[in-house]
Amino acid sequence: MDLIAQLEAEQIAALGKDIPDFKAGDTIRVGYKVTEGTRSRVQNYEGVCISRKNGSGIAGSFTVRKISFGEGVERVFPLYSTNIDSITVVRRGRVRRAKLYYLRARRGKSARIAEVANYKPKADAEA
């Protein structure tokens, strides 16, 4: 392991975050910490992951797209941000691309993603 990869691994271990295994096409729920004045709360942002950049390293990020009141809204989250409270995979999608930018031009049924039928979360598989 080279020096940079070793430093990244140390930083990831120091953060102690549990990032689930997800990829483009998966529907995920991101619990994001929002500060309003003096109060802080967790706001859930649920949508389809349309891209992941820079892998699972410390500089990695992912883009989540959702339709809010008829408008498409995309948000880019750094993977190891301190503002991210939790990431949960709601459902697995079956796609054949790594970047799903073509969903931006689609509306309605054509923007749907097929669900992986035989997906079982790791907690259920062990039980």
Swiss-Prot record:
Coiled-coil ranges from the UniProt annotation: none
The highest taxon in the source lineage is: Bacteria
Is Ribosomal protein there in the keyword field?
Answer: yes
* An example Gene Ontology CC term for this record: cytosolic large ribosomal subunit
Q: Name one GO biological process term.
A: translation
A GO molecular-function descriptor? structural constituent of ribosome
Instruction: Provide the alphabetized UniProt keywords.
Output: Ribonucleoprotein, Ribosomal protein
Please name the Pfam families in this protein's record.
Ribosomal_L19 (PF01245)
Do you know which PROSITE patterns this protein is assigned to? Answer: RIBOSOMAL_L19
PANTHER family reported in the protein's UniProt record? LARGE RIBOSOMAL SUBUNIT PROTEIN BL19M, RIBOSOMAL PROTEIN L19
Q: What does this protein do?
A: This protein is located at the 30S-50S ribosomal subunit interface and may play a role in the structure and function of the aminoacyl-tRNA binding site.
Q: Which family does it belong to?
A: Belongs to the bacterial ribosomal protein bL19 family.
NCBIfam families, per database record? rplS_bact (TIGR01024)
Protein's name according to its UniProt entry: Large ribosomal subunit protein bL19
Q: What is the lineage of its organism?
A: Bacteria, Pseudomonadati, Pseudomonadota, Alphaproteobacteria, Rhodobacterales
